[in-house]
A protein has these predicted regions:
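Short amphipathic alpha-helical "interface-anchor" segments enriched in bulky aromatics
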Residues: 174-209
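Short, conserved catalytic/metal-binding motifs centered on acidic residues
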Residues: 18, 44, 59-67, 84, ...
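A short alpha/beta connector and helix-capping loop motif
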Residues: 1-3, 71-89
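Active-site-proximal, Lys/Arg-enriched surface segment
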Residues: 1-23, 30
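A short, flexible helix-boundary coil/loop motif
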Residues: 111-130, 199-277
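Acidic, metal-coordinating catalytic cores used for nucleic-acid/nucleotide bond scission
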Residues: 63-71, 90-92
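An anionic, glycine-rich sequence signature occurring as long contiguous blocks
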Residues: 83-187
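Active-site beta-loop-alpha junctions of metal-dependent nucleic acid enzymes
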Residues: 32-54
């Protein structure tokens, strides 16, 4: 990176997070920091060894991005009694080429969801993912949605198209095409609900102390604080109390109450700090 026109060395820490998807709360379960010279999947396996023990009943399926679409990771999860859904990328993969050939003679399933038009091709029984301990299912979707784009300074409607591929150990008899599609897209919950929110409003991207134990302690403390605050916000506050008050706004209200002991909490009075000043 460059600072004041001079190139300097940038240091950063990398970690892997396990996060529950598909619910209305952002629920990060645990974090494992990557060690020097190791890749993300190695750290993820170490993390999941703990999570499979501590939170075994929380989930049945591990949803992951394309980095985890490999036999070693699939077999690791299968051996622990868990299924896998992973993004499938790369035109050179035997599995994707095989699926593309078989899908070419199929009519897609079609449905509309979340302002999208979806065409889906779904088959299981693939054995071309080398060294995986069970047959693999592949889902491919072509999706269209109307979006606003800026053209010559004006916002105009434009159709955006995207293609998605997933590989999974879950057979069609156990999970429908639409349910698998939803599970595959839920992989982004960890980005939208945790990483982006925690970096933007909770200081997750700031290293307060360069010590391995301290880094993990700060991250886990942040996770706990976010989960507790969300639980109070979504499970305790009534809709009229939440109206116009974002989650981070509630955090600021709580902080204000702590430093102003005589002030009534807005969730008791129904007025925000801005209303009472």
């Amino acid at each position: 990176m460059t600072v004041n026109g001079e190139e300097v060395v940038e240091y950063f820490h990398r970690g892997v997070v396990c996060h529950v998807v598909g619910c209305d709360l952002a629920l990060p379960l645990d974090v494992e920091m990557q060690r020097s010279g190791e890749n993300e999947v190695v750290a993820a396996k170490r993390l999941l060894e703990r999570v499979f023990t501590e939170y075994s009943r929380f989930f049945d399926v591990v949803v992951a991005d394309a980095l985890y679409c490999e036999a070693g990771f699939f077999n690791f999860c299968i051996q622990h009694g868990k299924d896998v859904v992973a993004v499938l990328k790369g035109d050179d993969r035997h599995l994707k080429r095989d699926a593309t050939l078989r899908f070419s003679s199929m009519m897609p399933q079609c449905w509309d969801r979340q302002k999208r038009q979806i065409e889906a091709w779904d088959l299981d029984g693939f054995t071309t993912m080398t060294d995986v301990d069970c047959p693999v299912r592949v889902l491919h979707t072509h999706e269209k949605r109307m979006a606003k784009k800026l053209v010559d300074g004006k916002r105009v409607n434009a159709i955006e198209e995207s293609d998605w591929w997933w590989a999974t150990t879950i057979s069609q008899s156990r999970l429908s095409t639409q349910q698998l599609w939803k599970a595959g897209h839920s992989r982004w919950d960890i980005e939208n609900d945790s990483f982006n929110e925690l970096s933007r409003s909770w200081g997750l991207d700031h290293c307060y102390k360069h010590s391995p134990n301290a880094i993990v302690a700060f991250i886990l403390t942040t996770f706990i604080a976010q989960v507790l605050l969300q639980s109070f916000y979504k499970r305790n506050l009534k809709p009229d109390r939440r109206a116009g008050l974002p989650l981070i706004g509630l955090a600021r209200e709580m902080f204000t109450d702590w430093v102003n002991a005589g002030r009534s909490a807005m969730w008791l009075t129904g007025h925000s700090h801005a209303d009472t000043s």
